[in-house]
A protein has these predicted regions:
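Metal-dependent amide/peptide-bond hydrolase catalytic core
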Residues: 4-126
Length: 126
């Protein structure tokens, strides 16, 4: 239940920024069973924001909340970072080009922040 509590905090905290994203993509409960209180679990955190500073503040808050939850519940935790990537905002000029093309096709233009970084990180380098 501690992880569920953390996940709810992460959702609220990310929403408070307006454009941050915090997700748990993996949740593993070794030897889990429907009638057993688990003694251990492993989970992933994915934190994204439009700037490194905003993401780092989100990370600090999430890890502080994790520590507080564990303290209150008499649990312990370890955290291991597996990947860190810089925020990769797309060029305003490229955004304008895409918006013009979409509008020229007679389609509505919608702006949204995408936390997806795979292609954006590479295009950001140009």
């Amino acid at each position: 239940m501690a992880v569920a509590e953390l996940m709810l905090f992460m959702e609220r905290r990310a929403l408070s920024d307006g454009d941050s994203v915090a997700t748990v993509g993996q949740l593993q409960v070794p030897a889990g069973s429907v009638n057993v209180v688990p003694g251990r679990c492993r989970f992933s955190l994915d934190l994204r924001a439009p700037s490194n500073a905003q993401r780092d503040a989100l990370e600090r808050d999430v890890l502080a909340q994790l520590a507080a939850i564990c303290e209150r519940r008499g649990l312990h935790h370890t955290a291991r970072e597996s990947m860190r990537a810089s925020a990769a905002p797309s060029s305003q000029a490229w955004q304008a080009r895409w918006e013009d093309a979409v509008a020229a096709a007679g389609l509505p233009v919608h702006r949204m922040l995408s936390g997806a970084g795979h292609d954006a990180m590479k295009l950001h380098e140009f």
